[in-house]
């Protein structure tokens, strides 16, 4: 069978949830008083939206093949990403065989090197790459995980990220990751409140349930060290993304400082094999958390995972729903997955990209069999208003 070529590439934007999961209405736990790099300024401390965390919005990339098959994916990128796709990246895709994903990734990355490398450009490349994998799998009438070598386990097991680990335990998750609420600018009183919250949750969940703290790039080495050492009393399993992503030296120091048995994790805001090579070779962490929608897509995550495996470091992708599920189920060094609790009070399981995607699977009792529908197995919700700002 002759493989089809790529006929059209289209980029859309949408507001209100979706891949930009911070784009939520008021009262959501994800926009509460959470420690951030901007929390050093009191006026930006109470809400993450106050400093613009949700300004980008969701980017939807749609790729149509010459046989009419359509692949798509969503990521964070919004109108900036749509511009990059339509004005720059589309030229490297249209007319190419749907199988030539490695070549297309290479051309997208190196053509944007002078203004890209990380951030919104890599988010955009990631979205295109995921759409290419969705397209190829649909052409072959297979789930993406079969293109990646097939599953190595029957089902995924999950920990939950959200404000209520105690409720996550009742729902069957293996652990709960809390957002850290107070950073260095709030002093010893804030540190005490962080520890009190951890102690409260430990008393609720017992000793056999993982508890972790997500620090979202907001700490420095001295504060993170104090937090880790004091939190050890409450059995903190790992401390996540304490420092700015580029502070590899700080991460290496922190990993030496934390109590024995506690893990340091990071990588949510890192990109490409070269960024993760720094983390791995400098022994910055015990597990890495690439986001497949930001780090370079499936094509790059394959390389990142192989690097980590050679360093005996686990790969636990950040969020990203079906895009990470199809990868995690195929890799031994990804023994569990993250589920982001998108219910406003973190009190029920709802799809991560709701309301944008239809057929998006969710864990039941903390477990999931990855669906075997072609591609990533999801559809765009026709009730979500997509806008194509740079139609060609």
Curated annotation (Swiss-Prot):
Task: Decide whether keyword Cytoplasm is in the record.
Answer: no
Any one GO BP annotation for this protein? amino acid catabolic process
Question: Catalytic residues?
Answer: 318 (proton acceptor)
The site feature described as Transition state stabilizer is recorded at: 338
Single GO molecular function: magnesium ion binding
Q: Which Gene3D superfamilies match?
A: Enolase-like C-terminal domain, Enolase-like, N-terminal domain
Q: Which InterPro entries match?
A: Enolase-like_C_sf, Enolase-like_N, Enolase_C-like, L-Rhamnon_dehydrat, Mandel_Rmase/mucon_lact_enz_CS, Mandelate_racemase_C, Mandelate_racemase_N_dom, RHMD-like
Known cofactor(s)? Mg(2+)
Q: Where does Mg(2+) bind?
A: 214, 240, 268
Q: Which PROSITE patterns match?
A: MR_MLE_1 (PS00908)
Kindly give the SUPFAM superfamilies that the UniProt entry links to this protein: Enolase C-terminal domain-like (SSF51604), Enolase N-terminal domain-like (SSF54826)
Co-factor note (free text):
Binds 1 Mg(2+) ion per subunit.
Q: What is the E.C. number? A: 4.2.1.90
Tell me which CDD domains the record gives.
MR_like_2
Q: At which positions is substrate bound? A: 22, 48, 338
Which reaction(s) are listed as its catalytic activity? Answer: L-rhamnonate = 2-dehydro-3-deoxy-L-rhamnonate + H2O
- Please indicate which residues carry the site annotation Increases basicity of active site His: 291
Does the record carry Disulfide bond as a key word?
A: no
Q: How does it assemble?
A: Homooctamer; tetramer of dimers.
- HAMAP family in the record, alphabetically? Rhamnon_dehydrat
One further remark on this entry is: Reaction proceeds via a syn dehydration.
Query: What is the name of this protein?
Result: L-rhamnonate dehydratase
This protein's species is Paraburkholderia xenovorans (strain LB400)
């Amino acid at each position: 069978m002759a493989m089809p070529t790529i006929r059209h590439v289209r980029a859309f934007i949408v507001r209100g949830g979706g891949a930009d999961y911070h784009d939520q209405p008021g009262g959501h736990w994800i926009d509460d008083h959470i420690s951030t790099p901007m929390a050093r300024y009191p006026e930006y401390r109470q809400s993450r939206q106050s400093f613009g965390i949700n300004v980008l919005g969701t980017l939807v990339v749609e790729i149509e093949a010459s046989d009419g098959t359509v692949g798509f994916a969503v990521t964070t990128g919004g109108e900036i990403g749509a511009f990059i796709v339509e004005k720059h990246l589309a030229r490297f895709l249209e007319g190419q065989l749907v199988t030539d994903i490695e070549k297309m990734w290479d051309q997208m990355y190196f053509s944007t090197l002078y203004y890209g490398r990380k951030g919104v450009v890599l988010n955009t490349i990631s979205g295109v790459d995921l759409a290419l994998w969705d397209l190829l799998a649909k052409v072959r009438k297979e789930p993406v995980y079969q293109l990646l070598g097939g599953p190595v386990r029957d089902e995924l097991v999950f920990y939950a990220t959200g404000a209520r680990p105690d409720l996550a335990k009742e729902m069957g998750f293996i652990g709960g990751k809390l957002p850290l609420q107070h950073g260095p600018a709030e002093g010893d009183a804030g540190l005490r409140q962080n520890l009190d919250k951890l102690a409260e949750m430990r008393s609720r969940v017992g000793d056999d349930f993982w508890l972790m703290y997500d620090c979202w790039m907001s700490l420095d080495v001295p504060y993170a060290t104090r937090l880790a050492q004091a939190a050890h009393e409450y059995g903190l399993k790992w401390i996540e993304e304490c420092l700015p992503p580029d502070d590899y030296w700080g991460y290496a120091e922190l990993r030496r400082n934390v109590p024995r048995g506690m893990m340091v994790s990071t990588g949510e805001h890192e990109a490409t094999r070269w960024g993760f090579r720094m983390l791995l070779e400098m022994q910055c962490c015990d597990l890495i958390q690439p986001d497949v929608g930001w780090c370079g897509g499936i094509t790059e995550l394959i390389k990142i995972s192989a690097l980590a495996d050679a360093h005996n470091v686990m790969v636990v992708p950040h969020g990203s729903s079906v895009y990470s599920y199809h990868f995690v189920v195929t890799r031994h060094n990804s023994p569990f997955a993250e589920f982001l609790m998108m219910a406003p009070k973190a009190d029920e399981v709802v799809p991560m990209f709701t309301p944008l995607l239809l057929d998006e699977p969710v864990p039941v009792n903390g477990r999931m069999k990855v669906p075997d529908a072609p591609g990533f197995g999801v559809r765009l919700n026709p009730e979500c208003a997509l806008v194509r700002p740079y139609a060609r």
